[in-house]
Amino acid sequence: LSNSWYIPSFFCGVGGTMFGPDGTDGSVPCDFDDEKGLAVTNYLIDLAANPKFTNQANEEAGKAINLFTEGKLGAFFSGSWDREAIETALGDNFACAQLPSFKAGDYEGTMKSYAGSKAIGVNPTCENMDVAVALAVYLGNADCQKIRYEVRGVVPLDSTGIDDVMLNAITDTVNNTSVAQPLVSEMNGWWSNAEAFGKAIVAGEVNHDNAQDKLTNFIANVNAGGSL
């Protein structure tokens, strides 16, 4: 919850939007402070207080993964970068799936993570343009994508010929349980504010009595580009 990449999946899951329906209009404010957003906030307050829930930021992921080895953890939200450690901990029990559904008050939805991609670019002012373009085309081809996935876990755009439990789950996640990460400059107001809000929930500073005020202040700062 204290990771600003993960926490929006709950708000987006019940229909919340950031900067327009497709995240491309910075003039349209984030609307997570409405009735649905309040229901999600109250849901997260209860989730953080649940003894079966563990909140580990990326730098502490190893602590949570170790719980798999001890048989004390049923599921973990992460990415391809943690596959080796999790698969080592679970052995034959290793599996992956798209994000789950949940119910926050009167609202039901499916968690929706940010989806994004990377590209291989060429400097338009480089001296050897033909060579640079040829290299970029080569690095972007299906064979190189497959190698990067097998060696580094970088998810390929072209997964032809790859049958893998994690890649299949990632494909399902992108297709069924994701929204495009907004790239507008107004997103600068999101990251630190979302992290602070998540940490406040985990610390118990956001509770059912002050949830609306805290949520309103959080989103106001997001839309203003300020900080809590």
Predicted feature descriptions by range:
Residues E70-S78, D92:
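Alpha-to-beta junction loops
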Residues D25-A57:
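Glycine-centered hinge/linker elements that transmit conformational signals in sensory
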Residues L1-P29, L73:
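Extracytoplasmic/periplasmic solute-binding protein
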